[in-house]
Regions:
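Short, basic/aromatic beta-hairpin or loop at an interaction surface
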Residues: 75-90
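A broadly conserved sequence feature marking short terminus-proximal activation segments
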Residues: 1-19, 101, 124-131
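Short, conserved beta-turn/loop elements at beta-strand boundaries and strand-helix junctions
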Residues: 64-69
């Protein structure tokens, strides 16, 4: 049994974790998640996109607490934030801790998710407020 990323094409299991995005070589736009079709900004083809490691750190721009969810995991309530990553793109992610608010600096942490059908432990990325 091994530990694997729940979404291996989006996340590298390092310490600290690395988010896998891309940069357009034509216009320098940085994006996450990687777009297999090309650049949304300038229209360049996917051949003009290069893989880019993004630091799992950023600033919270909006926060919401989810009290009802259509899946059993994650258990409710949980907090979701809109985070501008230090590398540029904006993502939505679960944030833990009681001091989550607009303007908070957050960093990514790997958390155990579920097990797959083969008994491998899956981990996912969440964020926590930087102390």
């Amino acid at each position: 049994m091994t530990i694997q990323a729940r979404h291996p094409h989006l996340l590298r299991l390092t310490d600290p974790p690395v988010i896998l995005g891309h940069r357009c070589t034509s216009c320098s736009r940085v994006a996450f998640p990687p777009d297999p079709y090309g650049c949304e900004q300038c229209g360049s083809s996917c051949e003009d996109l290069e893989e880019l490691d993004l630091e799992a750190r950023g600033t919270v721009h909006a926060v919401a607490t989810v009290h009802r969810h259509h899946r059993p995991y994650p258990t409710t309530p949980f907090t979701v934030a809109v985070i501008e990553l230090s590398g540029g793109p904006v993502i939505k992610a679960i944030v833990t801790g009681s001091q989550v608010g607009v303007g908070a600096e957050v960093e990514g942490v790997l958390v155990q998710d579920l097990e797959d059908t083969e008994g491998n432990t899956l981990v996912d990325l969440q964020f926590q407020v930087v102390q």
